[in-house]
Swiss-Prot record:
Any one GO MF annotation of this record: phosphoribosylanthranilate isomerase activity
Keyword hit for Amino-acid biosynthesis: yes
UniProt keyword annotations, A-Z: Amino-acid biosynthesis, Aromatic amino acid biosynthesis, Decarboxylase, Lyase, Tryptophan biosynthesis
Signal peptide extent: none
Similarity comment: family membership: Belongs to the TrpC family.
Reactions that this protein is recorded to catalyse: 1-(2-carboxyphenylamino)-1-deoxy-D-ribulose 5-phosphate + H(+) = (1S,2R)-1-C-(indol-3-yl)glycerol 3-phosphate + CO2 + H2O
EC number: 4.1.1.48
InterPro entries, alphabetized: Aldolase_TIM, Indole-3-glycerol_P_synth, Indole-3-glycerol_P_synth_dom, Indole-3-GlycerolPSynthase_CS, RibuloseP-bd_barrel
Coiled coil stretches, renumbered: none
Name of this chain's protein: Indole-3-glycerol phosphate synthase
Pathway note: Amino-acid biosynthesis; L-tryptophan biosynthesis; L-tryptophan from chorismate: step 4/5
């Protein structure tokens, strides 16, 4: 079993518990009380680099990264630094995240929020919107074509922007065929956790220029951002480097607006 398969198996177990506690119908009813979703795309299409700043306590590859006792405070720092969006990990077994973190961040900032998780069910898409998310992550490697299209369509129906994540050429072709407007290229292989520095440069040319390309993993400072911008990135998703920085606001500011 690959790392990705193991994570998804755990996600499905946790999902079953939440489904037994709150019905999909009740979740949908809760949408009436949620503010309309925010559109992140104008930020991503602006000149220079945009930053998706992540609230991330730990990862399968690095273990514990940061305690983050107050995700709302961290999110306010990111927003003050000019983050175009804030990514909140909600997977608990491997990443130490929760929907409570997402709700806390939503209450603290007006910045668009990405629910970063392993989305495999319609329930999770509705759950994301009910918690106040504006974007959801869809990992191509975790979904077959039918599920990928269904979840992408359901996200759009709810006004959510889907960040469609790819790791290799076949996945990139699937994302392009899907019509994904926001394509994330992750340098980390989720099946092995290895990082390949050439992944973005190899895959970005396969994505049409009218789509927004997001570089993910292996980004630690403005020099990394500049390299990805030269290769076609409009945005970068950064987690570890920001949660470990004593000045997350300044770190986001230094990575924002970088041009080739």
């Amino acid at each position: 079993m690959s790392v990705l398969d193991d994570i998804v198996a755990g996600v499905r177990l946790d999902l079953a518990e939440r489904e037994s506690a709150t019905s999909l119908a009740d979740l949908r009813a809760a949408l009436a009380d949620v503010d309309p979703p925010r559109d992140p795309m104008p930020h991503f299409r602006a000149a220079g680099s945009s930053v998706i700043a992540e609230v991330k306590r730990r990862s399968p590859s690095k273990g514990d990264l940061a305690t983050i006792p107050d995700p709302a405070e961290l999110a306010r720092s990111y927003a003050a630094g000019g983050a175009a969006a804030i990514s909140v990990l909600t997977e608990q077994r491997r990443f130490g995240g929760s929907l409570a973190d997402l709700r806390a961040v939503r209450a603290a900032v007006d910045t668009p929020i990405l629910r970063k998780d392993f989305i495999v069910s319609s329930y999770q898409v509705v759950e994301a919107r009910a918690a106040g998310a504006d974007l959801v992550l869809l990992i191509v490697a975790a979904l077959d074509d039918d599920d990928l299209r269904r979840l992408h369509d359901e996200a759009r129906e709810l006004g959510l922007t889907a960040l469609v994540e790819v790791h290799d050429e076949p996945e990139t072709e699937r994302a392009v065929a899907l019509g994904a407007e926001l394509v994330g290229v992750n340098a980390r292989n989720l099946k092995t956790l290895a990082i390949h520095d050439d992944t973005f440069g190899r895959l970005a040319p396969l994505v049409p220029d009218d789509r927004v390309k997001v570089a993910e993993s292996g980004i630690f400072g403005p020099d990394d951002v500049a390299r990805f911008v030269r290769e076609g990135a409009r945005a970068v998703l950064v987690g570890e480097a920001l949660v470990k920085d004593g000045d997350p606001e300044g770190a986001v500011r230094r990575m924002t607006g970088v041009e080739s």
